[in-house]
Amino acid sequence: MALGLGLIIAIILFKYKPTYVVSLCGEQIGYVSNAAELQNRIQSEIIDMDGENIDFVTLDNMPKYELKLVEKSLTTNEDEIMLALKDDAKVMYKYYAVILNAETITYVDNIEEAEEAVEQIKEEHKDDTIQLDLAVTTNYTENINEIGIQSVEVAKQEVEQKVDILIEEDEKTK
């Protein structure tokens, strides 16, 4: 009996290998041989994603793992799983709006430089007769492509053009 059991185990180990079936929202998305390695990869490549204007990344649905014996010929597909998870991830981007008299003039990605430019413009026009309510606000979006981010130099030029228009309009009314 022990010989028979040993033979069955040998056949199973010869034909099958232990592999994790990975599913997301109840849908099978692939196979991995090491669930811990995939979790580390998810953490480093998705959750801790680093890039321009990225504030944070969330995964609403974490993958589930189920250990199964599958045929040895089956190949794992960690890269495809990572692509599916990246598609499911929500990336929140941070950007800054330069506002003049309650009107958003432009968007930038560096708050320190934007605030410095705003202070320079305020200083240059402190003796003018018009009221300049200039500010920089922090904003967030999931789609950075919908925002036209400018360099701070371009933003400063756009604000100065608007200020010049306001000064001209103010002088015409006098």
Can you name each region flagged by the protein language model?
Residues 1-174:
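Membrane-proximal envelope biogenesis segments
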